[in-house]
Amino acid sequence: MTAYLLAGGGTAGHVNPLLAVADRLRRDDPAAEVLVLGTAEGLEARLVPARGYELATIPRLPFPRRPNAAAVRFPGEYRRSVRAVGELIRARGIAAVVGFGGYAAAPAYSAARKAAVPLILHEANARPGLASRLGARYTPWVGVAFEGTRLPHARFVGMPLRPEIEELDRVAARPAALAEFGLAADRPTLLVTGGSLGARRINQTIAARAVRLTEAGWQVLHIQGGRGELSDPGLPHYRLLGYCDRMDLALALADFAVARAGAATLCEFAALGVPAVYVPFPIGNGEQRHNAAGVVAAGGGVLVDDAGFLPAWVDAQLLPLLADRARVAEMAERAASVGVRDGSDRVVALIRTGLSAA
């Protein structure tokens, strides 16, 4: 029996690819032992046990970014976490550590190095995080979701997708999707989503132009997320949801989308051939703009800054684009040309390579 330690978490961007790879490992070898390392505060604390995997936790330990009391405590706390993970590796007979970034990842990478256990990394963002930059120094087996990601030994594997997305047959799922959302079969669908946390700029701008979008012959499936600040105007062909737990069905209908440029969103859209306007999150290290660069360069998406995504931009840019059905169809083909549906298989193949070289 082979035992794997999958390390990472914090956000859905780390947890979902981790779970996709865990599922693939378990499918390929039902006897395999898959243990997940995370923190008690991250999303993994809920999602990992719900999926049937054992979760081991270590303290949430952000890398210090300024000289303060936390920075003084960090080296000792980091060493304690590395020792705890090392003990776990020895006690459970871990054959390989597979990391996906997040707070639990870096101590796992250091522990794998000390234990001389094969380490395999997956970096989901085009601009790698601190944990991946550290871990990539310790291993030649580094998979990345985006071409051109600057990490040593990086090889393009795409994003491990949720099974319901990886296996989605959009044509076959369309009748169920139309029924789920109460939408019309004879209109193209514009999917609008800011993710689970929402995106105020996207929500406000689309709501301000809902009438014009529907008058242009489209129907709008608007998933506002977050705190649900918008009220449903009751317009025909405009469906406003606070949250959607069937994103597979939403994507089955999407002929075009407006969204943030998170790694998972981009990779799911590209894998399914959904063209989009991407409005990167305006705060942070600019990783969402980097994420979108490849699909935009391929012609499968349009990039607009958060501050520029205004009703006037919709009038001048989005509405004419949606009116050009040939361009929308071409953008769909170009998005699909950079999409990857077998990211889970590619990461598992990388794990097998690491094991065989050990």
Swiss-Prot record:
It is a peripheral membrane protein. GO terms for cellular component: plasma membrane. It comes from the Bacteria. One of its GO terms (molecular function) is UDP-N-acetyl-D-glucosamine:N-acetylmuramoyl-L-alanyl-D-glutamyl-meso-2,6-diaminopimelyl-D-alanyl-D-alanine-diphosphoundecaprenol 4-beta-N-acetylglucosaminlytransferase activity. InterPro entries: GlcNAc_MurG, Glyco_trans_28_C, GlycoTrans_28_N. Belongs to the glycosyltransferase 28 family. MurG subfamily. This is UDP-N-acetylglucosamine--N-acetylmuramyl-(pentapeptide) pyrophosphoryl-undecaprenol N-acetylglucosamine transferase. The gene is murG.
